[in-house]
C-alpha cells in the first residue's frame, strides 16, 4: 500500500486493530470460517 509509507508509527498501530476487527467482522458476515485465519481468538473477546 502506498499509504503505508506516509503513515506514522503511532497512527499505524491505531489503524491495525481496526483493520483486524474489520477483517474478522466481514469474514464472519460473509460466512468465512475464521478458525482457519487465526482470528478466532480476537473475535471471542
Swiss-Prot record:
InterPro entries: Corona_NS4. It holds the Pfam family Corona_NS4. It comes from the Viruses. Belongs to the coronaviruses ns4/ns4.8 protein family. This is Non-structural protein of 4.8 kDa. It comes from Bovine coronavirus (strain LSU-94LSS-051).
Amino acid at each position: 500500500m502506498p499509504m503505508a509509507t506516509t503513515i506514522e508509527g503511532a497512527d499505524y498501530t491505531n489503524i491495525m486493530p481496526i483493520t483486524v476487527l474489520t477483517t474478522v467482522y466481514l469474514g464472519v458476515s460473509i460466512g468465512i470460517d475464521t478458525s482457519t485465519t487465526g482470528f478466532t481468538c480476537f473475535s471471542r473477546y
